[in-house]
UniProtKB/Swiss-Prot annotation:
GO terms for biological process: trans-translation. Required for rescue of stalled ribosomes mediated by trans-translation. Binds to transfer-messenger RNA (tmRNA), required for stable association of tmRNA with ribosomes. tmRNA and SmpB together mimic tRNA shape, replacing the anticodon stem-loop with SmpB. tmRNA is encoded by the ssrA gene; the 2 termini fold to resemble tRNA(Ala) and it encodes a 'tag peptide', a short internal open reading frame. During trans-translation Ala-aminoacylated tmRNA acts like a tRNA, entering the A-site of stalled ribosomes, displacing the stalled mRNA. GO terms for cellular component: cytosol. It holds the Pfam family SmpB. NCBIfam families: PRK05422.1, smpB. Transmembrane segments: none annotated. Belongs to the SmpB family. This is SsrA-binding protein. Keywords: Cytoplasm, RNA-binding. Its main location: cytoplasm. It is found in: Cytoplasm. GO terms for molecular function: RNA binding. It comes from Rickettsia prowazekii (strain Madrid E).
């Protein structure tokens, strides 16, 4: 989306497990020790997803490793983190994820040009097993094609 961003972590499994229909950008509420840990790149959003809690949206299962120099002021690694969105966006998201089969998945986390941590979210629909198999076959075929072209 934005050219001036320093990517902290990406969720590569999300593109394999889901059909991404729409991509959104959201701010995230963090503690100081969490930001320091993110600057070191110590985070994982592989299993993370977002969900609504009334009129707010929270990011769940996002693992941010404890910052070793924060000692007693450290954060819990998997706490729910509030996402910062406009009210219109929240209503739109809640309407979409309440439909059966849709979920809100974290795709990447990055620092923008103002050094604020942003989360890229995708409104996604889960893939069936046969969809995943078809994606693997297509990927393998593209690899084979490129090998054949290089050999000629």
């Amino acid at each position: 989306m934005i050219e001036d961003k320093k990517v902290i972590v990406q969720n590569k499994k999300a593109l394999f497990n889901y059909f991404i229909e729409e991509i959104l950008e959201a701010g995230i509420v963090l503690k100081g020790s969490e930001v320091q840990s993110l600057r070191q790149g110590k985070a994982s959003i592989e299993e993370s997803h977002a969900s609504d809690n009334g009129h707010e949206v929270f990011l769940y299962n996002c693992h941010i490793t404890e910052y070793e120099k924060a000692n007693r002021f450290n954060h819990s690694t998997r706490r729910p983190r509030k996402l910062l969105l406009h009210a219109k966006e929240i209503k739109k998201i809640i309407g979409r994820i309440r439909i059966k089969g849709y979920t809100l998945v974290a795709l990447s986390m990055y620092f923008n040009k103002k050094n604020k941590v942003k989360v890229e979210l995708g409104i996604a629909k889960g893939k069936k097993l046969y969809d995943k198999r078809a994606a693997i076959k297509e990927k393998d075929w593209k690899k084979d094609q490129s090998r054949l072209i290089r050999q000629k």
